[in-house]
């Protein structure tokens, strides 16, 4: 309203059109040097909820005359779990990936979007038919960005990066705090970790960051301890977790949580825990180290958990270890980036 009052209706509409036109012209010019190039990419992500079989995302990216087409034909059918990704989230993350490579300093608006065409198979993991469970869509929408970036690394390698962590390790833990006299107090708390970003040509990946569509921060250890009977024992960057390369990938985060009372229950999820799902290297760069989660019991023994774990019991002195994935490397380690 303020802009309309300042410039008038016609002046406002003219300026809006100019902004959209600028974005459209910019992305068309950015794509022009790559006209005629095409690349296909696939990645796998864990299910471990409805099935032990991983889920496949596939895309073929083709650059036309100032246009980009991303065809996701070959992507897995929707599944009976919350990992299905609503089409709006799919579109958002595909556009993000294109912007990150070709126009990182430009506005993402409808002028930019007009240059991009998406083919999204119906009844698929990235365009599910209602009713479909979508509560954990953020895991799959991260993978949408990842697979598009993997294709673009073949088309515009100087502008791209290797695979980043999309492991999104998170958990929730709850129960009754029985440390004090009187009626036990119910609590719930949790945390989310960042990890390693993929390297680019001539630039190492950032360590301990959220990537792509995620914007979460580590919860302060002091805040967590105020919330309930869970202590943050330690937080560290994991040495050697970034993929080797002329430019190495960023390092993962590991955090350790100790339970201070009995009878708690923990659930959570993460991705990129298997050799076939870890962040991918480019031009000879090494893969990022996998994510992991496990419990070390107070009485001894270590208990690895799968990528989706529900209702695991924890008691006083037990420790939960949560580790994200490292970013992948770029180029052979023996060569200059």
Model-derived features: positions:
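Glycine/proline-enriched, intrinsically flexible loops and inter-domain linkers
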Residues: 1-337
């Amino acid at each position: 309203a303020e802009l309309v009052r300042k410039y008038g209706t016609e002046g406002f509409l003219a300026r809006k059109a100019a902004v959209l036109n600028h974005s459209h012209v910019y992305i068309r010019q950015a794509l022009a040097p790559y006209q005629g190039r095409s690349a296909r990419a696939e990645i796998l992500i864990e299910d471990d909820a409805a099935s032990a079989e991983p889920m496949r995302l596939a895309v073929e990216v083709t650059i036309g005359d100032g246009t980009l087409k991303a065809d996701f034909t070959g992507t897995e059918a929707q599944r009976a779990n919350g990992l299905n990704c609503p089409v709006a989230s799919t579109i958002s993350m595909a556009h993000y990936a294109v912007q990150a490579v070709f126009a990182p300093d430009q506005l993402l608006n409808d002028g930019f979007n007009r240059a991009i065409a998406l083919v999204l198979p119906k009844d698929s993991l990235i365009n599910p038919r209602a009713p479909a469970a979508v509560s954990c869509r953020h895991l799959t929408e991260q993978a949408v960005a990842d697979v598009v970036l993997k294709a673009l690394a073949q088309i515009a390698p100087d502008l791209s990066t290797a695979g980043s962590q999309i492991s999104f390790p998170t958990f929730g833990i709850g129960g009754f705090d029985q440390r004090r006299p009187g009626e036990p107090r119910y609590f719930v708390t949790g945390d989310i970790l960042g990890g390693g970003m993929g390297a680019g040509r001539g630039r190492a990946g950032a360590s301990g960051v959220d990537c792509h569509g995620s914007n979460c921060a580590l919860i302060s250890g002091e805040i967590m301890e105020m919330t309930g009977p869970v202590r943050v024992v330690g937080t560290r960057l994991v040495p050697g977790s970034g993929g080797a390369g002329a430019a190495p990938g960023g390092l993962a985060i590991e955090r350790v949580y100790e339970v201070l009372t009995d009878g708690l229950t923990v659930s959570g999820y993460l991705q990129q825990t298997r050799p076939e799902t870890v962040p991918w290297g480019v031009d000879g760069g090494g893969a990022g180290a996998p994510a992991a989660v496990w419990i070390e019991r107070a009485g001894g023994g270590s208990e690895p958990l799968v990528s989706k774990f529900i209702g695991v019991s924890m008691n006083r002195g037990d420790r939960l270890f949560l580790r994200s994935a490292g970013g992948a490397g770029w180029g052979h380690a023996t060569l200059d980036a």
